[in-house]
């Protein structure tokens, strides 16, 4: 009887053991990421109810800043979604989300100006932006695979999968660290 129980304990341990160190590393990082995203959304929502006295849209502000910097070839386009705004250096396009493009709020104007800051960085060959753009493909792959790999590794007690998932997650963290100076600089240029 005891030998049979020992056998089932081994199987349970083999398939369902979760190393607490993984939780100590992953859970805080995930919580920080979620809190940061929640704060961005909360701040945007708060200031999206404060409107510009000039009454011009975020798209118009973006076009004005681009023109003032001689970037006449950069287009401003609308993109679906909320807070999906970005500058695409391959197409030379500033894309503003539905919640930003036609809005006259100071939040939308700030987002549009920030994205134009990236276009200015691109035009002036800002080195950290070049580095960031070079590592984006690897980081995108890591962001899509990290959490599923970690979960699969924990469920099937496959430590190599967990380690690969943690490595992919670490690449995302490095990307965010490289991105911080680029983001601050884009806001300052705006």
Pin down the residues of each PLM region.
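Polar-ligand-bearing catalytic/cofactor-coordination segments
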Residues: 2, 6-20, 37-140, 174-190
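Helix-coil boundary and interhelical linker segments in multi-pass alpha-helical membrane proteins
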Residues: 14-22, 154-164
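N-terminal, Lys/Arg- and Ser/Thr-rich interaction peptides
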Residues: 21-39
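Alpha-helical transmembrane segments of multi-pass membrane proteins
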Residues: 29-35, 153, 168-180
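Short, electropositive, low-hydrophobicity segments enriched in small/polar residues
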Residues: 121, 157, 169
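Post-HExxH zinc-binding segment in Zn-dependent metallohydrolases
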Residues: 136-159
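Residues within membrane-spanning alpha-helices of integral membrane proteins
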Residues: 147, 166-169
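Alpha-helical membrane association modules
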Residues: 161-167, 181, 189
